[in-house]
Regions:
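Class I S-adenosyl-L-methionine-dependent methyltransferase catalytic core
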Residues: 1-273
Length: 273
């Protein structure tokens, strides 16, 4: 169950079944000797698994009334925590459930806000676990208590007990540089809204509050950006925000650099030949 701003949204049983099957596809699932659903709601996951289920407001007789975050649970090898935690403001409760679960489990499989795909959010997740699998879900994961569907942007992630390092959050400005004044720049890049990621020439009239200002690091890079920027699909990263569609500087370099690398490398090869 996800709880957002004190409203209860329950996971569809069909969705839970599909996600359980994804977890079962891993060899370790067969040796999971303790499975916990920490915020079980109507029991979408626990009713389809042999597991321990908790919820502060259970809607199924097999779910224990308890606050998972306050329970004195100990780590045990072979533990899997699976389900759909409450999200809270900006995913704060979901992160709390992640941290608690990773203290006691080898594997954590949760439906989470799509913002958990962002490197900045993943850096807040304990470094004891690494992301093993993720799948962006359709918007119709939830139903309300009255049975109506509720649309929320979510992702299903499986994390395994395997240490990792934090992501670097510094944009790699190898091809272009983010600047503060448009007088020093070549392009605008839309930061928010439906057209997030769109490139415009600096001569166009744009608002700095909704755009990044970018200077290409060479004339050839500027030409490549003008010709090929439209090939970049910004849909996935723009939808990973908590609120309105938006992209970060890191999103831009992560998306644009591989394309520019390929184009400029091919250009050099053509010149050599």
């Amino acid at each position: 169950m996800a709880k957002i701003q004190n409203d209860q949204f329950y996971t569809k049983a069909s969705v839970a079944k599909s996600l359980i099957e994804k977890a079962k596809s891993y060899e370790w699932f067969g040796s999971a000797n303790r499975i916990i659903e920490p915020s079980a709601g109507t029991g979408a996951f626990s009713s389809q698994l042999k597991c321990i289920a908790y919820d502060i407001d259970p809607k199924h007789p097999d779910i224990s009334a308890a606050d998972f975050l306050s329970l004195p649970l100990e780590y045990a090898p072979g533990t899997l925590v699976i389900g759909n935690p409450p999200f809270g403001d900006s995913g704060s409760l979901a992160l709390a459930f992640m941290k608690k679960s990773m203290e006691i489990a080898d594997y954590v499989a949760f439906i989470l806000p799509r913002s958990f795909r962002k490197k900045s959010i993943q850096n807040k997740v304990p470094l004891t676990h690494s992301l093993l699998f993720e799948e962006v879900l359709k918007d119709d994961v939830y139903i309300l208590p009255d049975g109506a569907e509720h649309s929320v942007k979510t992702v299903f992630q499986i994390w395994e007990k395997k240490s990792r390092k934090k992501h670097s959050l510094k944009p790699d400005e190898k091809f272009f540089t983010f600047v503060k004044k448009h007088e020093d720049a070549d392009f605008w890049v839309r930061r928010v809204g439906w057209y997030a990621g769109r490139l415009s020439h600096i001569s166009e009239q744009k608002s700095p509050s909704s755009h990044y200002i970018i200077r290409a690091n060479s004339a050839s890079i500027s030409t490549a950006m003008e010709r090929h920027w439209g090939q970049i699909d910004w849909e996935d990263v723009a939808e990973d925000s908590v609120g309105p569609r938006s992209i970060s500087k890191l999103d831009i370099t992560d998306k644009a650099n591989p394309l520019l690398e390929s184009i400029l490398c091919n250009s050099k090869t053509d010149l050599i030949e």
